[in-house]
């Protein structure tokens, strides 16, 4: 417990909040170029081949971003839009690629939750 005199001299320090997506530098999304597109395996107890991409952002940062949805058209040098949001079972993956923006196509045959996967409304 500090004395009154110590508080006058130093004051209370407020704990600063750290960002969950520091590479975006406060932006909601950022554009980037895929440097590598590959699959990786999740932590135990899950098992799959998760699609991820290494992306160099316009601010110079390089991040690993998850490619959501079934199937994708990304390859090296594709221009993508990156948003924050981690993938719990992939260590080090703190970003998502936005489907349906820039070079990333939306998910084909998607019927529900289309807005999250960049899919247009199906016309009957």
From Swiss-Prot:
<dbReference type="InterPro" id="IPR012340">
    <property type="entry name" value="NA-bd_OB-fold"/>
</dbReference>
<dbReference type="InterPro" id="IPR006032">
    <property type="entry name" value="Ribosomal_uS12"/>
</dbReference>
<feature type="region of interest" description="Disordered">
    <location>
        <begin position="1"/>
        <end position="42"/>
    </location>
</feature>
<dbReference type="GO" id="GO:0015935">
    <property type="term" value="C:small ribosomal subunit"/>
</dbReference>
<protein>
    <recommendedName>
        <fullName>Small ribosomal subunit protein uS12</fullName>
    </recommendedName>
</protein>
<keyword id="KW-0694">RNA-binding</keyword>
<keyword id="KW-0820">tRNA-binding</keyword>
<feature type="compositionally biased region" description="Basic residues">
    <location>
        <begin position="113"/>
        <end position="124"/>
    </location>
</feature>
<dbReference type="Pfam" id="PF00164">
    <property type="entry name" value="Ribosom_S12_S23"/>
</dbReference>
<feature type="region of interest" description="Disordered">
    <location>
        <begin position="105"/>
        <end position="124"/>
    </location>
</feature>
<dbReference type="GO" id="GO:0006412">
    <property type="term" value="P:translation"/>
</dbReference>
<keyword id="KW-0687">Ribonucleoprotein</keyword>
<comment type="similarity">
    <text>Belongs to the universal ribosomal protein uS12 family.</text>
</comment>
<keyword id="KW-0699">rRNA-binding</keyword>
<comment type="function">
    <text>Interacts with and stabilizes bases of the 16S rRNA that are involved in tRNA selection in the A site and with the mRNA backbone. Located at the interface of the 30S and 50S subunits, it traverses the body of the 30S subunit contacting proteins on the other side and probably holding the rRNA structure together. The combined cluster of proteins S8, S12 and S17 appears to hold together the shoulder and platform of the 30S subunit.</text>
</comment>
<comment type="subunit">
    <text>Part of the 30S ribosomal subunit. Contacts proteins S8 and S17. May interact with IF1 in the 30S initiation complex.</text>
</comment>
<dbReference type="GO" id="GO:0019843">
    <property type="term" value="F:rRNA binding"/>
</dbReference>
<feature type="modified residue" description="3-methylthioaspartic acid">
    <location>
        <position position="89"/>
    </location>
</feature>
<comment type="function">
    <text>With S4 and S5 plays an important role in translational accuracy.</text>
</comment>
<dbReference type="GO" id="GO:0000049">
    <property type="term" value="F:tRNA binding"/>
</dbReference>
<keyword id="KW-0689">Ribosomal protein</keyword>
<keyword id="KW-0488">Methylation</keyword>
<dbReference type="InterPro" id="IPR005679">
    <property type="entry name" value="Ribosomal_uS12_bac"/>
</dbReference>
<dbReference type="GO" id="GO:0003735">
    <property type="term" value="F:structural constituent of ribosome"/>
</dbReference>
């Amino acid at each position: 417990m500090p004395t009154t005199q110590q508080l006058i001299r130093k004051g209370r320090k407020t704990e600063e909040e750290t960002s969950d997506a520091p590479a975006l530098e406060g932006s909601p999304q950022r554009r980037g170029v895929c440097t590598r597109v590959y699959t990786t395996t999740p932590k135990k107890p899950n098992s799959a081949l998760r699609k991820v991409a290494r992306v160099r952002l316009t601010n110079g940062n390089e991040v690993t971003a998850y490619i959501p949805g079934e199937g994708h058209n990304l390859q090296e040098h594709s221009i993508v839009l990156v948003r924050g949001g981690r993938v719990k079972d992939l260590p080090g993956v703190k970003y998502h690629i936005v489907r349906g923006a820039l070079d990333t196509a939306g998910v084909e045959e998607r019927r529900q939750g289309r807005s999250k996967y960049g899919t247009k409304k199906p016309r009957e």
